[in-house]
């Protein structure tokens, strides 16, 4: 049983999806941790990137599809920032408004169909398979890791943005990363669904907290690496749950439990440390 859980295929898939979804976690890291803004447009922006990438990829331009997805994400981030900085809308409400509007926009991009397929369409991953044939079956991970490396470098630079432009530029970068993640996922699984972004903000938050708890947050580079690690670990936990034949209908519950545990981890660690200190103090007192 353990051999099947820790099989190379499970680990590889978890790493591939972890790198793709890590872009969303990095976007949330920028908006939530650096800008201190609760951006709730993540779900809709992710689906927007997925839908735009699908439409452009269908025309035979998979790489242009990713750029188009990022451009769409920038537009989403700009609207969110405009509502906050120019119209005085609270960040949470701005995210909700944009997320609500994006549902109709996403449907329109998808031709008012709830699903799209790229089964017979060339994707960046099929191109990478030919270009990176020397990597064997690891070409998807190599491509996803390369994107993460570029995004991580951009994230470190973004942390020093002039405060005067922080909200607008930061949310535009955040939207671009989120939409890029959606575009990559669309080409990875060769499909798009109108509900693909549902719950994405909570999943990204879980990845962010897992990474910061296990890796730490002393330096910006360490925090970025922690986000990627947290995303991969989250995907591995989901893969293990599937290996235990957890019904697909129960995966939302599994995700909710993972998120709850991840969010409470700092408090749990603090409580354990406090109990250890109290126990040590009691032992010293009894020794005296």
Go through each PLM region and give its residues:
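Cytosolic-side transmembrane-helix boundaries in multi-pass membrane proteins
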Residues: 6, 162-165, 218, 237-288
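Transmembrane helix-bundle core of multi-pass membrane transporters
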Residues: 91, 95-153, 192-194, 250, ...
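Transmembrane alpha-helical segments in multi-pass inner-membrane proteins
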Residues: 175-252
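Membrane-interfacial amphipathic/re-entrant helices at transmembrane-helix boundaries
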Residues: 1-24, 58-64, 138
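Alpha-helical transmembrane segments within multi-pass membrane transporters and channels
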Residues: 61-100, 142-145, 149, 230, ...
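Membrane-embedded helix boundary and interhelical linker motif in transport proteins
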Residues: 32-87, 107-113, 127-134, 243
